[in-house]
């Protein structure tokens, strides 16, 4: 598989989306790009995304510390990734990594079609795994965990002709059992949702946190995120730490319900599907 060729002057610099210097690159995560506004927390507008790309594609002054570059990623595989985000990425000259739910492609409305994923790969973007059905990996039985990891990897590799070496953990949830399973399945990179945990390696798996991009994040907020001052970083760390404490107190399942309420998520407003939903879906097209 060829390397992504990213402009060397861009804030999004990376020789490869995965071979970035340890701890030296911020990773941004988008979900849906929408033509207009939405109450959904991760529903970023097309105009907003275009402004973000303008910032990321322009030469940026580096602070004395050397600054940070940014890797653009998408989670879920919403069809807006192709219809709205892909054309804007092509215009900007930037590349992204799309972590998609292999079990939903070509089967469920609002998800990518395989033909669309192939077009993005052909244009130099990467498509990697977000699991098979968006089940929280920490809540899976050993057999279901293996299915989520290996089935998605094999499906993506077979359909797209790519090497799948990275996975974005649904909900950002992971633990040592998940890391072990990822290693057995042949992954090399595991992305989660805590950007303040130092990049590390366990059992041959590189662990990397990411910043979730929300609908409230304008260009100035993005700039501060990528090049934060000490006070801003302390505030962001405190806020994320508070969220993690609430999650630990409530447990994954109850916290997920709480998150859905906070994020204004409801069916059709983002992507949360279970294996049985996919098993009962009759709309699969093997040639889409």
Feature map (PLM): residue ranges:
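C-terminal active-site subregion of NodB/CE4 polysaccharide deacetylases
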Residues: 2-73, 78-83, 139-146, 150-165, ...
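Acidic (Asp/Glu)-rich catalytic clusters
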Residues: 20-22, 57, 86-94, 112-129
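Histidine-centered divalent metal-coordination motifs
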Residues: 31, 128-130, 134
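Active-site glycine- and acidic-residue-rich loops that bind
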Residues: 76, 105-110
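A short alpha/beta connector and helix-capping loop motif
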Residues: 80-102
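Conserved SAM-binding loop
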Residues: 94, 135-137, 157
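Short beta-strand and adjacent tight-turn residues that come in two discontinuous sequence segments
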Residues: 99, 130, 192
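Surface-exposed cleft-lining segments at the edges of enzyme active sites
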Residues: 102-105, 134-142
